[in-house]
Amino acid sequence: MRSAQVYRWQIPMDAGVVLRDRRLKTRDGLYVCLREGEREGWGEISPLPGFSQETWEDAQSVLLAWVNNWLAGDCELPQMPSVAFGVSCALAELAETLPQAANYRAAPLCNGDPDDLILKLADMPGEKVAKVKVGLYEAVRDGMVVNLLLEAIPDLHLRLDANRAWTPLKGQQFAKYVNPDYRHRIAFLEEPCKTRDDSRAFARETDIAIAWDESLREPDFAFVAEEGVRAVVIKPTLTGSLEKVREQVKAAHALGLTAVISSSIESSLGLTQLARIAAWLTPDTIPGLDTLDLMQAQQVRRWPGSPLPLVDVDALERLL
């Protein structure tokens, strides 16, 4: 016997969260809980404003229609990426095919003061990997901050993300302030420039490796080995079903590229599932999941060690 519930939720964000020049005051999304017999599976559907093509209102309509079809015996996945991902996670939990083992080691995220990151990294055991958002301020300042971090922590490897913010000139201004002796410790810089060709040129001219992120979701993207390209960053909420995520990881690994499972600012429930997906598909790579502290609460499932208060399922708005 099948049954299902759908919940709508909204989490207040910290004041300083800006996405694509828009301040994100709340994180809005949906949960689906599928039950069959004694088993149940959960999934999160939370399109990311400014990045997802769909809104959460679009996703809600598609999800409710899919759930009604599933209750009637139809299992075909929806095409909308955020719904396909959340539904496929719920189905995988239901079928017990999503392993429980999780990689909760997140690369800490630096959004502002580099001193905060230095203190956080001092207590980090093992491999020291951190992520820094660049492109929000002047490129020269970004270069100086990155250089400072690499100089202060000799065993640090940085992942940088520019979200296509730079012109070729700004990319050169950034690189000018990063000591060439430190550049090999930049694990990769995600999408430095507005076009892929400009990003490729940046990698050639600066000897700083790059990674594809937004490019993966463009219709003309193909997985090929390219000089200067070291990694792909896979955001499942923006990608689609678990199977599609798995295919992209497999394609990247076949080319010798690092595949990083990365957050789209999901709630704690979604983040714990991403940690499980990372342990399963990319066991040797620290995922990019350090986004929970941007929110003011956890929901339904806790992220280990987080002091944020937990909102129980009973407090959520039930739609079905």
Curated annotation (Swiss-Prot):
A GO molecular function annotation here is:
O-succinylbenzoate synthase activity
InterPro entries assigned: Enolase-like_C_sf (IPR036849), Enolase-like_N (IPR029017), Enolase_C-like (IPR029065), Mandelate_racemase_C (IPR013342), OSB_synthase_MenC1 (IPR010196), OSBS_N (IPR041338)
| UniProt: Mg(2+) binding residues | 161, 190, 213
Query: One of this protein's GO BP terms?
Result: menaquinone biosynthetic process
- The protein's superkingdom reads Bacteria
Please list the coiled coil stretches: none
**Positions annotated as active site in the UniProt record:** 133, 235
Q: What is its EC number?
A: 4.2.1.113
**A Pfam family for this UniProt protein?**
MR_MLE_C
- UniProt protein name: o-succinylbenzoate synthase
**Which species is this record about?**
Escherichia coli O6:K15:H31 (strain 536 / UPEC)
Q: What is the lineage of its organism?
A: Bacteria, Pseudomonadati, Pseudomonadota, Gammaproteobacteria, Enterobacterales
